[in-house]
Regions:
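Phosphate-binding/switch region of NTP-binding enzymes
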Residues: 51-52, 57, 171-255
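Conserved catalytic network of the ASCE P-loop NTPase/AAA+ motor domain
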Residues: 44, 83-87, 116-119, 144-146, ...
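The Walker A/P-loop phosphate-binding site
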Residues: 7-109, 333-335
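Amphipathic, non-transmembrane alpha-helical secondary structure
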Residues: 65, 69, 73, 134-145, ...
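C-terminal regions of RecA-like/P-loop NTPase motor modules
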Residues: 3-9, 145-146, 222-335
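Conserved inter-motif catalytic segment of the P-loop NTP-binding fold
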Residues: 85-169
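Short gly/ser/thr-rich secondary-structure transition/capping motifs
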Residues: 30-37, 134-135, 197-200
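Alpha-helical scaffold elements adjacent to nucleotide-binding pockets in ATP/GTP-utilizing enzyme cores
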Residues: 66-67, 102-110, 139, 172-176, ...
């Protein structure tokens, strides 16, 4: 199976090589059709692929699904803004890793993000967990060839290759992706793991993706349990401000963390403390002083001294929290 796939890709590469041409310096190419923006920065366009990298369980998939929700709804989701042209509105997810139940639950969250009553007809989700690399590639080729396809998410790209440390195989796969996006004018989002030992995308495949991708984004799990999306490599624009998300128990879905996590000592009154308080007491509606300090420190992103001397007294004084018999709770207005 591996040999057949490699031979097929080699044959295609030989055929594609005949497409070499001199670049016309007197003819300006069509303008880039930018479809993914983050914080006003240009991240991804049709005819290119981008990469989302990160350690396992860092929530790479959550951000990818937010792209789907944004592309279909036309609104910003988790800080990501997708804008597909009218003739390229179809969105495709190739999920190679999740179980059926995990995929179902993730799609329900995407549905909630996009505020859809039902899943739209221009969205197609493939369950490819049991498929071989050659079978995965066949589905990808068919979806790219559909004239209305604008966005394809590959979760994850390692399932399109036998050996991600094989230089030749990795090179052929990346060149194949470049040919598919260019020929069919689609944008592909690859999800790739980062190696725990090197902190780089895995193998020769990861190195080549970083080299040829339009943008590489990295998802990092923070100490307080939040996840941060940041720019690692940006070819066509400056880095965007990192986007941080957290699990919002109030809506049973992910939300963008409020701005001002690292505010200065003198502007406590300008902060949306209510959101922070909800998160501090999300898992336990009653805290002792030691645990309260830990939670305040993590959620606000401040030092323990600042939490103890400034923040907690401020929250008590302004009735964001209440102290009853040595325990701390969210303040509840009796009226």
């Amino acid at each position: 199976m591996a040999g057949k796939l490699l031979n097929k890709l080699l044959d295609e590469q030989k055929q594609a090589s005949s497409g070499a041409r001199l670049f016309d310096l007197n003819k300006q190419p069509p303008a880039e059709n930018w479809v993914l923006n983050i914080g006003g920065k240009k991240v991804g366009s049709l005819g290119n692929f981008i990469t989302i990298s990160g350690l396992p369980k860092a929530r790479k998939t959550v951000f990818a699904h937010a792209m789907i929700a944004s592309a279909i709804s036309g609104s910003t989701c988790l800080g990501l803004s997708m804008n597909l042209p009218e003739n390229k509105r179809d969105v495709v997810l190739l999920d190679c890793e999740q179980s059926e139940n995990s995929l179902w639950n993730a799609m329900q969250r995407a549905k909630q993000m996009g505020k859809w009553e039902r899943f739209p007809e221009n969205m197609r989700v493939w369950y490819l967990r049991k498929c071989s690399p050659s079978e995965n590639m066949e589905i990808l080729e068919k979806e790219c060839a559909r004239s209305k396809t604008g966005l394809i998410i590959i979760d994850g790209l390692l399932n399109f290759i036998i050996d991600f440390n094989n230089v030749e195989e990795s090179h052929i796969l990346v060149k194949k992706l470049m040919n598919l996006v260019d020929t069919n004018n689609v944008m592909i989002v690859n999800i790739l793991h980062i190696s725990k030992s090197t902190n780089f995308t895995v193998g020769h495949l990861g190195s080549l993706c970083d080299r040829y991708t339009q943008s590489t984004l990295e998802v990092v799990k923070l100490e307080n349990g939040d996840s941060e999306l940041k720019a690692k490599y940006m070819r066509d624009d400056e880095n965007f401000e990192p986007v941080t998300i957290y699990w919002n128990h109030n809506i049973e879905n992910y939300s963008v963390s409020p701005s001002g996590s690292y505010f200065e000592d003198d502007n406590l009154e300008d902060v949306n403390h209510g959101t922070y308080i909800d998160r501090i007491f999300a898992s336990n509606d009653e805290q002792d002083y030691t645990n309260l300090i830990k939670r305040v420190k993590l959620i606000y992103g401040k030092t323990e001294t600042f939490a103890r001397k400034k923040l907690i007294p401020f929250l008590l004084e302004n009735r964001y929290i209440d102290k009853i018999e040595g325990k701390y709770k969210k303040f509840t207005n009796p009226f």
